Swiss-Prot record:
SMART domains: OmpH. The lineage of its organism: Bacteria, Pseudomonadati, Pseudomonadota, Gammaproteobacteria, Enterobacterales. This is Chaperone protein Skp. Belongs to the Skp family. InterPro entries: Chaperone_Skp (IPR005632), Skp_dom_sf (IPR024930). One of its GO terms (molecular function) is unfolded protein binding. Keywords: Chaperone, Periplasm, Signal. Gene3D superfamilies: Skp domain. Molecular chaperone that interacts specifically with outer membrane proteins, thus maintaining the solubility of early folding intermediates during passage through the periplasm. Residues 1-22 form the signal peptide.
Amino acid sequence: MKNRVYMLGIIIWLAQINYVNAANKIVVMNVANIFQQSAQRTEIIKQLEYEFKDRAAELEMMEHDLQTKMQTLQRDGATMTASDRNTLEKSLIAQRELFSNKAKLFQQENHARQTEERDKILDMIYKIVKNIAKKENYDIVIDTNAVVYFSSHIKDITDSVSNQMRVK
């Protein structure tokens, strides 16, 4: 009987030790914070602005031209001949449709490029996290945005990941 109580005490003690060790192998990080502060993100923003600069300028010119024609139609429409007014209206409709199509295509391509570049940065972050986790023997790495609460004894590796992002 004494041996059973003694063995039960040892089993409970070992279970508590494993629980404490498991908590030490769980870490958190803030992916959004790392992403927002990365130098790569700043570079990508500048690169994409440069890449789409000419098309954005073209769309601005088209929009300005459309507004000018619409103002002309509103201002002089009553005094124009019917054929001139009809021609201007058809021109406006065609130009507005062309502008709309170009703007939609621009937005789609810009969004696709932003997504592509964002995914590259996130992939870089995840590779760094994986390397840190392997090096430090962490079992689980959790994004702080996916957790409602975590105790202060859980290690946060956000700064370590951010520092390695600066090096790359």
